[in-house]
């Protein structure tokens, strides 16, 4: 793995200012590493920001962290969420849904899905506290949400209109197993259930649209992140390797 490939993942999936000359094909080729490299990095940055700001803002830090999370992502995935919301609201044939998916204007469906996301995200972030578990929660949720979105792109054929979806699908063929294996240290038994249910829902949505796309992948990252996070918080990462690691760290003297 070369430094160029690593930097390319940060340049594509985040708003972190790194220079990369990699093409979209090169980024897609090595994107299977992004859940580990980018996901863990984002989780650590968000954790440090939360723990520092908690000393000043207390329990309200979760609201500020929402802005930090979206800034780190560059609002790119949020755009996919809005587009998907508009497409889901369309009653008609596939062509009308695709037109809504590609439309730059935001309709009622996009606003509605945004409100759903914000509601879940705010609840999840306000449940965080000043503890070691917060670090592991955020790392786990970032890794899982990125892995899920790439797994969708790798296993569901893209819509003809999505160049990004086509490239990622072609480059990730045969790597879906790797994406699942990467999850093992970070996923709890309960989030396995969340992963499966979310994938089944997106599979159904992709079926109505004719395939996957970059917008669907972005929406999947955005929506699944708070779901994974709130599940981790409720279950304390039970039955995961991270929970064992967290327990050992918290009991070191």
Swiss-Prot record:
Keywords assigned: Cell membrane, Cobalamin biosynthesis, Magnesium, Membrane, Transferase, Transmembrane, Transmembrane helix
Cofactor: Mg(2+)
GO molecular function, one term: cobalamin 5'-phosphate synthase activity
Transmembrane segments: 33-53, 106-126, 132-152, 178-198
Biological process according to GO: cobalamin biosynthetic process
Organism in which the protein naturally occurs: Saccharolobus solfataricus (strain ATCC 35092 / DSM 1617 / JCM 11322 / P2)
Main location: membrane
Entry similarity comment: Belongs to the CobS family.
Subcellular location: Cell membrane
Protein name in the entry: Adenosylcobinamide-GDP ribazoletransferase
Lineage summary: Archaea, Thermoproteota, Thermoprotei, Sulfolobales, Sulfolobaceae
């Amino acid at each position: 793995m070369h430094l160029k490939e690593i930097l390319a993942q940060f340049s594509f999936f985040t708003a972190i200012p790194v220079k990369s000359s990699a093409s979209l094909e090169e980024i897609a080729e090595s994107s299977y590493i992004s859940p580990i490299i980018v996901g863990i990095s984002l989780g650590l940055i968000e954790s440090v920001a939360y723990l520092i700001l908690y000393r000043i803002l207390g329990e309200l830090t979760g609201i500020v962290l929402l802005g930090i999370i979206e800034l780190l992502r560059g609002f790119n995935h949020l755009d996919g969420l809005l587009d998907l919301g508009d497409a889901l609201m369309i009653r008609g044939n596939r062509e009308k849904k695709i037109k809504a998916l590609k439309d730059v204007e935001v309709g009622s469906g996009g606003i509605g899905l945004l409100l759903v996301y914000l509601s879940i995200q705010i609840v999840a972030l306000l449940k965080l506290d000043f503890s070691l578990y917060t670090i592991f929660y955020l790392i786990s949720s970032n890794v899982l949400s990125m892995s899920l979105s790439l797994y969708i792109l790798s296993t569901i054929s893209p819509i003809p209109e999505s160049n990004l979806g086509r490239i990622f699908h072609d480059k990730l063929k045969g790597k879906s197993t790797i994406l699942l294996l990467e999850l093992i240290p970070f996923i709890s038994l309960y989030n396995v259930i969340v992963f499966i249910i979310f994938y089944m829902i997106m599979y159904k949505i992709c079926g109505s649209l004719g395939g996957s796309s970059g917008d669907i992948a972005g929406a999947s990252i955005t929506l699944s992140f708070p779901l994974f996070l709130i599940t981790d918080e409720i279950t304390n990462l039970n039955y995961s390797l991270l929970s064992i690691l967290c327990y050992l760290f918290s009991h070191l003297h």
